[in-house]
Amino acid sequence: MNFNLLNKVIAGIVFLISFIVLFMTVQPSVSFWDCGEFVAASVSLQVPHPPGTPFFLLLGNIFSKLPIGENLGYRVNMISVISSAISILLLYLIAVKLIENYKGKKADNMFDAIATYVSAAIGALAFSFSDTFWFNGVEAEVY
């Protein structure tokens, strides 16, 4: 039996849960440390400090022009929210592949499919709500 649709549905749910929680807790403005520097450098397309993080700055410049939020800090912070939610989605998909490789086969019955997909979802969401990931997923910071 093929459980690809179930895998895709659970992957979408994992993405939505992490995105919604990060979106609801995103910094409304510039936060501490380098965030203000990254926001200012994104708006003006300048190098914040070497090596410069050019891709983040280009995305920050694009997001700073979007008509969302009240200020530039919020707009640039949304890059971290979106990229963090995508990271959790990819972590879920990688965990599914690792579990399937460990077992030596894809799920062939409903119990194996649910065990594989739910355990990968729990692992991905546990990482999503860990302190360090969550803290850096809601502010304009590059690591």
Model feature map: region roles:
Residues V26, G60, S64, Y92-E100, ...:
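Membrane-water interface at transmembrane helix exits
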Residues M1-N4, V96-V118:
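Membrane-interfacial, low-structure loops and terminal tails that flank and connect transmembrane helices
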Residues G69-N77, K105-T116, G123-Y143:
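Aromatic- and kink-enriched transmembrane "portal" helix at the membrane-lumen/periplasm boundary
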Residues L6-I17, R75-S80, A115-G123:
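Alpha-helical transmembrane segments of integral membrane proteins
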Residues A41-P50, P67-E70:
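Short aromatic-rich membrane-water interface segments that cap or initiate transmembrane helices
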Residues G12, M78-D108:
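Transmembrane-helix motifs of polytopic, lipid-linked glycan transferases
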Residues N4-F32, F127-F129:
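Transmembrane signal-anchor helices characteristic of membrane glycosylation enzymes that use polyprenol
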Residues V26-F38, P48-L59:
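Extracytoplasmic catalytic/substrate-binding loops of multi-pass membrane glycan-assembly enzymes
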